């Protein structure tokens, strides 16, 4: 390699070329751009229920209105035809036709009564959703807007107590009314109502969810037939939703039960498996029982988690006041009980079998 000779002037020239002149900025000319990608991802995870709310309460289209009007006209026509058939049979002394007319009229009235009853139950479920939205609006108000005393929060709580069938002389309701002060804001009134009146219902709901999750996990872990597990879990989940709805004062019919199931499953689909992992954390990965548990027990744990998640979402929808972040029941709360019950039941059974052998 040939030798290179550098001059002192060349080195100084290169050093001076690397420096740039100083720049000064005024305060008004500064335009700071923040990287909001992290905030956007966080908000996207927090707002997974926003599109769900539009699916729960969609806008009624013109075709749906025409369909409802057609069904109403068709029902009125059937009722009028049955009455006309009954009158004609009586006038013409056609007794056999008269009996058939009476039976048909009875069936029509029975069907109309069932439709009206289902409609009332759907209206009741819609009222519950409206109450939840009002509670969210009250909680989202800023403290500046709550300086003036307002009775909206108290009226909302009394309406909720009436819809849930809570007696006016209930100790919890009386204790809440004694704690309410005129200077309290609507947010504080809702918080007191939730702590004094709804917390006992929440405790019962959490016990029901934990019990059903553990029982479902045990049945799947023990049962050798997959089809039996499938029908059993479906029956247990529907039964759990009915129990939670009855606990919070909602009378579910066939259509309203399907509507509630749709709400719960759509919300679970929006949340996705990432939310399940976030709730549980990575504690299970650090535990050493994965090497000891069989595939059947792992299936039982998975079914128990899904049952608990279904119950939690059903509880959130049946609860008249939207669940606050500090009141929310998470899957991690059921984790210890689920694992403890499975280990105690299954491992103790295996030890007994080994002793018998």
From Swiss-Prot:
It is a multi-pass membrane protein. InterPro entries: DUF697 (IPR021147), UPF0283 (IPR006507). The keyword DNA repair does not apply. Its main location: membrane. It is found in: Cell inner membrane. Keywords: Cell inner membrane, Cell membrane, Membrane, Transmembrane, Transmembrane helix. The chain crosses the membrane at residues 67-87, 96-116, 213-233. One of its GO terms (cellular component) is plasma membrane. Belongs to the UPF0283 family. This is UPF0283 membrane protein HS_0596. It comes from Histophilus somni (strain 129Pt) (Haemophilus somnus).
